[in-house]
Design a protein with these regions (language model features):
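A Zn2+-metalloprotease active-site environment signal
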Residues: 1-154
Length: 154
């Protein structure tokens, strides 16, 4: 309950600044604050149950069960991407309020994108693409600048 795991090797591997590391911590804190793991489990169970009932009603047998499991996984990917986007933005605000430079969120994801290459197709990923994350964060930088400036004065 409430623990955050942080792979410290990423600090050296990506040569992260304190501000960039704070963005990761803010992101992970946002997951905990928004209870994403609990929500994802509940959504997954509800989706699985609904698809399983539909499969049985349609008389699809074991093939229907396989399709229901695949459907559950694909449907919950969107929830996961939404959770990641929310955590990026809430984490950005948390870090800005703590006095860390909001622009570090963009440089962090530029480094992450460069390190990971193209990766898998975005529709199969549990996370938004690096380009989408960067675009979303850049669009939200003006919203948190005042929070950062107030924290920097304190």
């Amino acid at each position: 309950g409430g623990k955050i795991a942080f792979y410290t090797g990423i600090l050296d591997q990506l040569k992260l600044s304190d501000d960039e590391a704070a963005m990761i911590m803010g992101h992970e804190m946002a997951h905990a604050l928004r209870e994403h793991a609990r929500e994802r489990l509940a959504k997954s169970q509800a989706t699985s149950f609904g698809l399983s009932i539909a499969s049985q009603l349609l008389g699809l047998g074991s093939l229907g069960d396989v399709a229901a499991n695949l459907g559950t996984q694909l449907l919950t990917l969107k929830y996961s991407r939404d959770d990641e986007t929310e955590s990026d933005l809430v984490g950005l605000e948390i870090a800005a309020r703590a006095g860390y430079k909001p622009e570090a969120s963009v440089s962090l994801w530029q480094k992450m994108q460069a390190a990971s290459g193209n990766g898998s197709p975005s529709f199969l990923s549990t996370h938004p693409s690096g380009a989408n994350r960067i675009q979303e964060l850049e669009a939200n930088l003006p919203k948190v600048q005042q929070l950062y400036q107030q924290a920097a004065k304190s």
